[in-house]
UniProtKB/Swiss-Prot annotation:
Belongs to the mannitol dehydrogenase family. The gene is mtlD. It comes from Aeromonas salmonicida (strain A449). Its EC number is 1.1.1.17. Pfam families: Mannitol_dh, Mannitol_dh_C. This is Mannitol-1-phosphate 5-dehydrogenase. SUPFAM superfamilies: 6-phosphogluconate dehydrogenase C-terminal domain-like, NAD(P)-binding Rossmann-fold domains. NAD(+) binds at T3, L4, H5, F6, G7, A8, G9, N10, I11, G12, R13, G14.
Length: 381
């Protein structure tokens, strides 16, 4: 099976690309980094350190790479059986025009066999979003063929892949042993690909929100509380018993929303929370707080990992004290190298916390919840 994967970074190589290669797919990475492309094509393999309770070194073999800005990527789309992405939400829109050109060329070449596209991004229904962007570039005359032949399959992905430490091998990547890749089986065209580690479901949103409200919420609360206390890594922060307790409580608050909304078993979800806390404390992962905390404006948006679970607590009349504290800590996030962090601090200086919070989150500036968060923001100074 031929797979084209957009994004040859650590997540692409260490997570999605690895699972596909392990399933005997012919994986071609598409990326803008010419040095990375040359290295992958020269060696056609790379090492993956899988770390956790059991450690192992895997070698991913028989891979290739092309420039995502060149003509060769179009040729790969013409013959691909599967297209996947791990480029980040901010870059996803930028590959839509390339994908549209490739699909047009595919149809012109007479290839009407099923093609499935899976965006493996930290965003809700990211593939559906990509589909709408692709349709903006694909001529209307091709839309009916596109609808019958191409499946845009939403997914939920979960694996911590920190930036690789400097070493002599630029292709080497370190990943945690845990991974989860859940796909919406109702959106595939043709047969579902058989990939160990890819789990089909007909209830994707339950798993999307479980991951967003637990892993992502816990991760970001750990980062922002850890930043306030001067820690550098997620592990350092989560080993602080005060922070660990607050992060657990925040995930319990968001978990109560999931139990109400989707009927998750409270005991099983409590065990899931404990598993995530253990993942944050993995001594073999050096996951920097500024990597997790970056782009605070995106992470404070209404549909993201802090405000969306908070809105759920308001919907169901549930407690939210520790989610509020996580949002308050986010407002304190400073990082001169992060344009969004700089913009956030400028908004706070210009508008004050209530109006700035309303601008960023969509919450009403005069609401009780904003007043409560501002009080926590002031108490953290």
């Amino acid at each position: 099976m031929k797979t084209l994967h957009f994004g040859a970074g650590n997540i692409g190589r260490g997570f999605i690309g690895k699972l596909l290669a392990d399933a005997s797919h012919q994986v071609t990475f598409a990326d803008v980094n010419e040095t990375l492309i040359d290295q992958l094509n020269h060696r056609q393999e790379y090492k993956v350190h899988v770390v956790g309770a059991d450690q192992k070194l895997d070698v991913v073999r028989n891979v290739a790479a092309v420039s995502s800005a060149g003509h060769e990527v179009i040729a790969r789309i013409i013959t691909a059986d599967l297209v996947t992405t791990a480029v980040g939400p901010n870059i996803l829109d930028k590959i839509a025009s390339t994908l549209a050109k490739g699909l047009q060329a595919r149809f012109d070449a007479g290839n009407l066999s099923p093609l499935n596209v899976i965006a493996c991004e930290n965003m809700v229904r990211g593939t559906s979003h990509l589909k709408q962007e692709v349709l903006k570039y694909l001529p209307v005359a091709y839309h009916a063929t596109h609808e019958s032949c191409v499946g845009f399959v939403d997914s939920a992905v979960d694996r911590i892949v920190p930036p690789a430490a400097a070493n002599d091998d630029p292709l080497e990547v370190t990943v945690e042993s845990f991974s989860e890749w859940i796909v919406d089986q109702t959106q595939f065209k043709g047969e579902l690909p058989q990939v160990a580690g890819m789990e089909p479901t007909d209830n994707l949103m339950a798993f999307v929100e479980r991951k967003l409200f637990t892993l992502n919420t816990g991760h970001i609360v750990t980062a922002y509380l850890g930043k306030l206390r001067g820690y550098r890594t997620i592990r350092e922060a989560i080993e602080d018993p005060v922070i660990r307790s607050k992060v657990r409580r925040a995930m319990e608050e968001s978990g109560a929303v999931l139990v109400k909304r989707y009927g998750f078993d409270p005991r099983l979800h409590a065990a899931y929370i404990e598993k995530i806390l253990a993942r944050f404390a993995n001594p073999y992962l050096v996951d920097e707080i500024d990597r997790v905390g970056r782009q605070p404006l995106r992470k404070l948006a209404a549909g993201d990992r802090l405000v969306k679970p908070l809105l759920g607590t308001l919907e169901y009349g549930l407690p939210s004290d520790h989610l509020q504290e996580g949002i308050a800590a986010a407002l304190h996030y400073c990082n001169a190298d992060d344009p969004q962090a700089v913009e956030l601090q400028a908004l706070l200086a210009e508008l004050g916390p209530a109006q700035a919070l309303a601008r960023v989150t969509g919450l009403a500036a005069d609401s009780d919840i904003v007043s409560a968060i501002v009080a926590r923001y002031d108490s953290l100074k």
